[in-house]
């Protein structure tokens, strides 16, 4: 499987320089678009986590920005005019509960008891855009598939 995007640095709209309307509770919440190619034909579900291991020296743990589980592959729209097999559109995290309610978005690091942040599920169980306080960080989007939820 291969993940790709139309950028190599997360664009401002999806991170700390996003417009005010893209924030909720002081956190950028509009998720970035990406593509998934070379998916195993036996796979029925997608799962992923978007994490920041560079946060460990800053806050003491790897920051979880977004986690998704049990996303049915057949619920995603295939664009036969596109060269990519699957496209995750911008703002998918906020749209997902209404579009595919059986898919779970796990708690992100904003839910940590060490931070004392929001308890709003729209913040703690959705995408949280990068806001590194010290320097540019390297992020990882880890993608998994399964044949059962």
List each model region and its residues.
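N-terminus-centered regions that define maturation/targeting leaders and the start
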Residues: 1-146
């Amino acid at each position: 499987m291969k993940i790709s995007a139309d950028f190599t640095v997360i664009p401002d709209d999806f991170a700390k320089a996003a417009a005010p309307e893209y924030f909720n509770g002081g956190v950028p919440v509009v998720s970035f678009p990406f593509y998934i190619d070379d998916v195993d034909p036996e796979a029925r579900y997608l799962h992923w986590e978007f994490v920041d291991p560079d946060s460990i020296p800053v806050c003491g743990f790897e920051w979880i920005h977004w986690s998704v589980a049990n996303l049915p592959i057949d619920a995603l729209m295939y664009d036969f005019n596109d060269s990519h097999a699957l496209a995750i559109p911008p703002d998918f995290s906020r749209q997902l509960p209404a579009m595919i309610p059986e898919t779970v978005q796990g708690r992100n690091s904003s839910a940590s008891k060490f931070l004392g942040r929001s308890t709003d599920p729209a913040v703690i169980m959705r995408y949280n855009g990068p806001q590194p306080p010290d320097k540019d960080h390297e992020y990882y989007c880890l993608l998994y598939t399964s044949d059962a939820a």
